[in-house]
Structure formats: C-alpha cells, structure tokens
Amino acid sequence: MKRLFYTLLFFLPCMLIACGGRDDTPDGENNPPVVAPPSEEPVDSRLLYNGIRLPEQWPPVRSSSSELEKGMSPFYLSDKPSVINISVGRQLFVDNFLIESTNLKRTFYYPEYYSGNPILTPEQDWEKTGTKGAAFAAPFSDGVWYDEKEGKYKMWYMAGGGSYATSGAGVTCYAESTDGIHWTKPILSVVAGTNIVDYNSERDASVVWLDKQESNASKRYKMFLVARESGKWRYHYKTSPDGKVWRAAVQSEPIADRSTVYKNPFRNVWVYSMRHNVRVDANKLVRARDYNENADPEAGTKKAEALLSAFWFGPWANEQHHTDYPNIAPAIYNQDATPYESIMLGFFSVWQGPENDVCASDNVIKRNQVMVGYSRDGYSWFREDMNPFHAVNTTTSDAWNQGNLQSVAGAPLIVGDKLYFYLSGRRLRGTQEITTTGLAMLRRDGFASMKGTGELQTSLLKFDGSYFFVNANVTGEMKVELLDPNNKVIEGFSKDECKAFKGDNVKAKIEWTGNASLASLKNKQLKVKFYIDNGEIFAFWISPSANGESMGYTAGGGPGLNISGIDKTN
C-alpha cells in the first residue's frame, strides 16, 4: 500500500502537467512561444539606436511665435552622448556628431541632373489639366520605390485628371520601369484603358509608402492622400497589397494642403508633417510645419490635426531669397523625409515667391527649390548648407525645371554606386504650366565629405560589427588607427599597421597587418582616427559581414538590396 502511495505521488503531478490546462490551448507546432522573463535592466524608451537620449518632453514644445523663422538646431550636436553607437548603418559626415577633432574641411555636394530629363511627361488625355493646354505628370510627393520582391521600379504620380478630375483636381497614376530611367504607363483595370489607380477626390499632395517592414501583405503599400471635402483638407489613409487597388481606411481631422507623411523606422513611428500657414499680422503669412507622430498609421491619421500647439518649424533665418523678388521672405512649402543608412534625410521645398496672384500677372512660376537636411532623432533637423540640393534652371527658356520643384517620397533609390533622386519641375508653355518628372544622381553617401590633407578623430564609439569599411576618394593615401578611451593606440590597430587605402571606392575594406577583423573589439569603447593625404571621406561603418552590408536603412531601395529595406545579406 505504501509503495502504491509513493507511486501515485510521483505520477500524478506528471499527469497533471501533461494533461492539464485549458481545453482550447493549441498543441503541437501551434503552441505559443515561451516568453522570456523580463530583463532586470529596465528598457530606456528614450534611448535611441545611436546613443542619443530624447528629452522627457516628447515631442518637444516649440513656439510658433518666437521660433517661427529660426529653423532648428539639434540638441544632440551640443549635448552629445558619452558613447555613440555606430552599429546601424553607414556613418555620414553631414554634421559634427561623430567628430571629436579634425583639421579637414566639410564639403557639400549636389546631385547632377540626368541629361535626358524629363523622364516622365504628360502624354495622355487624363494627364491634361483643364482645357487651355496645361498638363501634369509628376509626383507631388507621391512616391518612387524599388520593389525588391518584384525586381521593378515603381512610381505613383499625380496626373492632371482630364475628364476624371474632381473640381479641377488631379488623379493618381502608376508607372513602372526596369532601369529607373525609362518608364512605361501600364493599362490597368481601376479605370479601364488608363493607368489611374485613385480618383474621385479633390486631391492635393499624396504619399505612397512601400512599407518593407510591414508583416500584413494587404497593407504593404500605404497611401496618405490629402484631399478636400466640404471645404476641409484631410488625410485619407488607404492600404493596398499591390499599390494599384486601394482600400480606404480612415480620415484625419482638418489639416492644410501640401501635407505629407513618412515613416521613421529608427523609432518605428509615422510622422505627420503638416503644412500650417501661420498668420503673423495682416500683411504677413509664414508657411510652416506642424508635427504629429504615431506608431500606428491608422490611429495616427485619425488623430492628425494642424494645430499651432504642435508647431514644428518654419524657415531658417538664412534661407536664400528669390533674386527677382528679393523682398519676399522665404518659407517652408513642403517637407518629405526618408530613412537612409543611419539618419533621416529631409527634403525641404523652400518657397521663395512670388504669390500666386503675382505669378499670374507677371506670367512666372512660383519658385520652390529643394534643400536637404539631416536628422539623427527624426525630429531635429540640421541644415548647415543652405544652397539648393535641387535647383531651378534660370538660364534655359524652355527648361523642364524652370520653377516649383518638389521632392518625391521614397527618394533616394540606391542604384549601384549612385543615388537616384526623383523630383517634379514646371515650365511655362505660353501662360500654361507643364509639370514633368526629372531625375538627379549623386554618389552613394555623397552628400558631404571631410576633405583635404590632415586628420580626423571621432568621438567615443561602440559597435557590434567586425569589418571596417569606408566610402572615400583618396589621391594620396588614407590610414586608419583605433584608439582606446584614453587616446592610446590599441595594439594591432596602429596607423603603421594599417594597410593604406588609395583610390575611389564607395565600399572599401580597411585592414591591419595581422588584423583583418575587429571582432575582438566588439562592444568595446574606442575612437577612430583617420589620416588622409589629399583625399576625402564620405562615410565609414563596421559591418557584420566581409561583404560590407551596413545594417542601415536603404531609403527607396534598389536592385540587389534586401527586401526588408535594411542593408543586410539576402
């Protein structure tokens, strides 16, 4: 009897464990994964991927009066992290964030326009605007992306609308390409015999975002259309599995026209960049932006509203003026942004005048030029160089880009060693505007370099990669040295042990005699010191792979890149 008691005592708990639980608990392969216990170390939600810690008040509160025309000054450039994490993406020298000391000079570069511009023109009846000869076939933000799943370039653009226009507004069309330069307009079924994919709205700006991190295939394409109903502009959020057939979801609160949306994947939030015309007095109106963010694009759209309490930024104090209308104060007409490598790239359409009534009387096109800015927190923008990134052509009478240049969502695309930027431009045919799409190209990472003969020492860094890469153009030679936190050379990684680099390469591996890898230095704190003789460096990064993938974001994508939108091994 005693033996039976002990036998039952042993087997009963085992049977309860094996058989117990709710009847509806899945079994086999459907069992939910084991949840690891929470870490003893609390997660700091304000700590970003690069070591920047966001302020407690987020988003920051800014004044729409005292800061209206002062642009922005990122806090993290004057209050740097004690250690900068460079594990994500190529590290660009667009500001002084990475630099502790240097005697090299920062040089900015600008994309070159493709000689065959424009690459997309209005040729169809549904691309005409009105009946007097105006026509429109260009993104108004909209989007140009490379879809790695299909191996195809894709463009969404605004067309004049022709007979499909609502209250004179445009429609949304789709085009595709195999090389990013030559485009076709496929005949689709949404509107029989056309390439229209969205209409029946009084549209203004729109954004089509190819969300490469989206797990729900039916929402891989997201549209944030700005359209007017009953006199009010609102975001109209739509989703699609293919970018052609769209399902309407929700609308926002009232906003203004020329508002945009983009994803900041570094923080996994959707940013609502809302135009706000701030009335200063009876004679002065300043075009500025309001800010909203939300991790859920549907909830974010529903809450989005243009309010001065959400003021973000207006023009910088040193914006360039229109040479023919020098007394007009410049303003921010639009802002788009794209995640590229380790930063957010911002594109600012800076309005330089004149107002529409003056344009009509003087028979000119209002001047918007596209400027570029950089952000490491997704909110604070740095614009040291105030020259146009995409400039109007004032010397050729029939140039496609005479005026009103606008940036495009998704740009740039990474095509080999180059970046492809798409933009819209306008010209006059008599008194009618013709709006077309252009292309500009830049060296990969080629926004700015540290140039000359001299040295550059970084701030204290940490990383989890193994292979050191640079994007550089060096006529003499470049060597790299690694230092500990006390500025002492790390054994095996001295300047003398570094194999000198010479040449022009957007992805060159740096090695040391006896040390082809930095694996032994993972997660240790160190500084990098560059010695450059007659050359320039655009970027550096430490890759987990000998192939040089950066683990950064790839903006609008490109041939051969990972479908995730991250530069990692396929």
Residue spans for each PLM region:
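Carbohydrate-active catalytic/glycan-binding domains of CAZyme proteins
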Residues: 31-570
